[in-house]
Amino acid sequence: METENTSGNNSDEPPLIIESEQSMFERFKRFILGAPRNIRDPQIFHRISLIAFLAWVGLGADGLSSSAYGPEEAYRALGEHTYLAIGLLLATAITIFIISYTYSRIIEHFPYGGGGYVVASKLLGPKYGVVSGSALLVDYVFTISVSIASAADQIFSFLPPQVAHFKLFIVILGIVVLSLLNLRGAKESVTALMPVFLLFIVTHCILILGGIAFHMFEAPRVVHDIKHGFNNGLGMFGVAGMLALFIRAYTRGAGTYTGIEAVSNGIQIMREPKVETARKTMVYMAISLAVTAGGILICYLLYNIVPESEIGRAHV
């Protein structure tokens, strides 16, 4: 690739990019990664930066994906003590808003990027920054692997058992596709994933609202079961025992809170004013994640869902 300045002596204008003959590898690379950017173009950042809505799609998907497995794991951990799910619901929503508010404050104080590595390095020292950064890398690896594996489980649960041996291939393919999309750039990956993200939001809203609307008549039964469960639990385990059960379920569902930090880490790719854009994105993410996770737990109660382990115990 060669460049040529066709603007005379005016060196302020970005040079034109002239395509030279490309090898097969270069053409394949361009097909996978996209065309190169002209870094001298003064409008390049404006073109690739994200407004609040697009940032919510691109970065919010990290947090929202955890709602597909976090609430379920927490509910499973309750076992037969599903009456504690109402407290779990409140604790989950409160935790999401506390974490989101904390990262909003970090965004204000670190407007050029306030991830765990930067904050810990600046406030506590470089060693703590390395620990925080390493934890974040591990968290991202787990988030990707668990989210893709959970998606494969959900998809193959609708398919005949005969095709289950394709699950590993689909998981690996999903990771490869996501990696290639992100290598093309933040805005390109957001554009490609927007239909999937919006489909996730719309379907969850329909199912949660529909589940609540069609089972509102179950509310008196749920209230009675919760009161009865608390009375029996206090008599059987005491306050300390019930608190231990609740904490166990709460920690098992901690995956719900992964990905909230993505907005603070990705503030560099947001449209000016960055701080305001990042704060709006954080609000979108907090509300959508709290509503989705909380709505799923409410539907579990209304539908009187029993964890699988308890079903197996009942048949023994």
Task: Indicate where each model-derived feature is located.
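Flexible hinge motifs at transmembrane-helix junctions and intramembrane kinks/re-entrant loops
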Residues: E2-E4, F156-I170, E188, A213-F217
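Extracellular loop-to-transmembrane helix junctions
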Residues: A74-S121, P126-A135, S145-G174, L199, ...
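Select transmembrane alpha-helical segments in multipass membrane proteins
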Residues: R47-L59, G125-L137, I170-G174, L234-Y250, ...
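Helix-loop junctions at the membrane interface of multi-pass solute transporters
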Residues: G58-L59, E72-A77, S104-H109, V119-K122, ...
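Extracellular/periplasmic helix-exit of transmembrane alpha-helices
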Residues: G211-R221, K280-R313
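Membrane-interface "cap" regions at the ends of multi-pass membrane proteins
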Residues: E2-G70, Y101, Y112, S121-K122, ...
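Hydrophobic, small-residue-rich membrane helices and short re-entrant helix-turn-helix hairpins
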Residues: G185-M194, G259-S288
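Helix-loop-helix junctions that connect adjacent transmembrane segments
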Residues: P42, L198, V202-T256
